[in-house]
Amino acid sequence: MQSWRQQLNLFLIAMGFFTRIPMPKWVEVDAEKLNQASRYFGLVGTLIGVLSALVYSVMLHWVSPSIAIIFAMIASVLLTGGFHEDGLADTADGLGGGWTVEAKLQIMKDSRLGSYGALALVLCLLLKWQLLSELALFDPSSVSLALILGHTLSRVVAASFIFSEQYVSDDASSKSKPLAMQQSINELSILLATAAISLLLISFMQALVLILGLLSVRIALAWWFNKQIGGYTGDTLGATQQIAEVVCYLLLLIVGASW
């Protein structure tokens, strides 16, 4: 087992990759360590979820839950620099506008926002806000828990693609290129353990619904991306995170209303 300092180094790499939080200067970064850092992508999601939930809880003292949710969403975007939202938009533009695999991948690399990407972004943000606002009607405090679970579990789902799917982008300058190295069972185990620990925050039946629902989404997206482009790219990982986050809020709303 690697030392705690090595593990901390990997976590800080993951944090630096997925957020705008600066890494300490002593952190050692290379392609191999970035690939190993994928084990902590879920934990970085927990950090983002906790900070977003903190913003929500503070704002709740002065504004309504629906407005506090907007501030929490803004906080998460500022923390990540819209990293995953950008991936969602690029994926929507590529898969919506390209007729061949090559064209789809080329469109994804284009930094300009197209109509498909704009629609995907607007719909995704509206869905997040509406689902969390509906959750707040049952219990305003449940939104904080939803934010933590949503940000954690969605990143676990996205990062798990590295273990089983084929990386297809040939762009050497891509920020996610080092992730193309296949994830080891050790990385996947720690990733899944993070998800399991976060699920202890809710009841067994609620956790079971989330597991089955997110597993179904993961299988469906893997099938769709393989059919469309033959594997995954950094952009489709971002799209997966955003879709899984929305589904997580939807499932929490369903089970919250049922149990």
From Swiss-Prot:
InterPro entries: CobS. GO terms for cellular component: plasma membrane. One of its GO terms (biological process) is cobalamin biosynthetic process. It catalyses: alpha-ribazole + adenosylcob(III)inamide-GDP = adenosylcob(III)alamin + GMP + H(+); alpha-ribazole 5'-phosphate + adenosylcob(III)inamide-GDP = adenosylcob(III)alamin 5'-phosphate + GMP + H(+). The keyword Transferase applies. It comes from the Bacteria. Its cofactor is Mg(2+). Keywords: Cell inner membrane, Cell membrane, Cobalamin biosynthesis, Magnesium, Membrane, Transferase, Transmembrane, Transmembrane helix. Belongs to the CobS family. This is Adenosylcobinamide-GDP ribazoletransferase. It comes from Shewanella piezotolerans (strain WP3 / JCM 13877). The gene is cobS.
